[in-house]
Amino acid sequence: MSLANLRTHYTADVRPDKVENGQKVTLAGWVHEVRDLGGICFVVLRDREGKAQVTLVKKKIDKDLFDAARRLVRESVISVTGSVKFEEKAPNGYELLPDEINVLNVSGSPLPMDTTGKVEAELDTRLDSRFIDLRRAETTAVFKIRHESLRAIREYFVKYNFIETATPKVVATATEGGTALFPITYFDREAFLNQSPQLFKQILMSGGFDRVFEIGPIFRAEEHDTRRHLNEATSIDVEVSFADHFDVMELLENLVAYVYTRVIENCKSSLEVLGVDLKVPKTPFLKLTYDEVIEIINSRCEEKMHWGDDLGTLGEHTVGDHVYETTGESHYFIIDWPTEIKPFYAMPYEDRPEFSKSFDMMHRTMELSSGAQRIHIPSLLKNRIESQGLNPDGFEFYLKAFEFGMPPHAGWGMGCERFVMTMLGTENIRDTVLFPRDRRRLSP
């Protein structure tokens, strides 16, 4: 058989509106299950889109074909040509009566893990054998939804006249200061894997690009070992000229609603596989000031939060529960953070410089995004760099862009994995990335 003839349809494409009863089709995929009942044999073929039942009745079919089907090894790769018989009780509403079964590759045995869902596997086992785990319907569904989310994000930004960019991931200096960087050797110099495209996004504002977005990897050398942290992640970043923090908050909340809408419209079967009943968040999202957040936490928790503290995990859950109980919504903003606990490029308020024009977009369970109006005045920016104990000389390439006409601008960054995780209610962020990198895992 020619490779071009190994498949005519995906399993989900065999439907009464596309295929006639009795029509010949060829499906290709993996042997999900074989059920030999003596006089009848069922082979469940699985591909990316679902499953199809191949039915062989001993008295009605060639003996060699029947015996070959009975001997099929689970997870072997096969191509099956046969006639479609629509049957409500069969998987996907039809069965395939085969004329030919081609075994393209025989699977080894025993399998590293079960793909049918009958035997649960721990996350580490699944990640160690990711090539098998990716064949599970639940795993595939997560990545179909992630794909649709990123497609919708690009669609949204193109609709609003954004330019997609790609900035360096190998840099000479820290983006936001601190030590959470992975050092690498760059010929005869020390360099780092970039922790954020922040500085480059701002340079693009000086370059007149006006509205940019980027979807790309970021690297954080933080020794977290939690269900919601990764050391390599995908960041969705935005920067907008002639805008303040309220403008980009509106952009962000509308993006979230847009993506949820697209996922609901285009990922019905994947959501069904995961048992997720997705609802579009209502906009505008509630905005709480940093001071209001302190009041909420201190009224509900024994462990008090003080002005100048960052928000810990307990605080995030406490405020998230409060918002959900009072509004029925999971997304909200925290605004007006203390200047000193935000990055040096966050713009302070002119009349109360101890507060910054910054925000975090929160989910009921965790932070999803952080953003701000940026400082565009060179002297103020340099002072803020120095006030955080950083050397302006290390940011020369960045500061130059502010000396020759930098417009007011604002932006944000959002982690793709956390966004998908909270959308689907996934327990561990590692389930939302194909090959996760954390402090313990560097392979596969």
From Swiss-Prot:
Which residues take part in binding ATP? 220-222, 228-230, 367, 415-418
Q: Which superkingdom is the protein from? A: Archaea
Primary subcellular site in the record, as a coarse category: cytoplasm
Q: Where in the cell is it found?
A: Cytoplasm
Q: Which GO terms describe its cellular component?
A: aminoacyl-tRNA synthetase multienzyme complex; cytosol
List where this protein forms a coiled coil. Answer: none
This entry's comment on the bound cofactor is: Binds 3 Mg(2+) cations per subunit. The strongest magnesium site (Mg1) is bound to the beta- and gamma-phosphates of ATP and four water molecules complete its coordination sphere.
Q: What is its EC number?
A: 6.1.1.23
In the UniProt record, does the keyword Oxidoreductase occur?
no
Q: Which cofactor does it need?
A: Mg(2+)
**What GO molecular function annotation could you give as one example from this UniProt entry?**
RNA binding
Query: Which amino acids does the record list as binding Mg(2+) 2?
Result: 367, 370
How does it associate, per the subunit comment? Homodimer.
What does this gene product do?
Aspartyl-tRNA synthetase with relaxed tRNA specificity since it is able to aspartylate not only its cognate tRNA(Asp) but also tRNA(Asn). Reaction proceeds in two steps: L-aspartate is first activated by ATP to form Asp-AMP and then transferred to the acceptor end of tRNA(Asp/Asn).
The protein's matches in PANTHER family, at most eight in alphabetical order, are given as: ASPARTATE--TRNA LIGASE, CYTOPLASMIC, ASPARTYL-TRNA SYNTHETASE
The UniProt family comment states: Belongs to the class-II aminoacyl-tRNA synthetase family. Type 2 subfamily.
Q: What is this protein called?
A: Aspartate--tRNA(Asp/Asn) ligase
Q: What is the lineage of its organism?
A: Archaea, Methanobacteriati, Methanobacteriota, Stenosarchaea group, Methanomicrobia
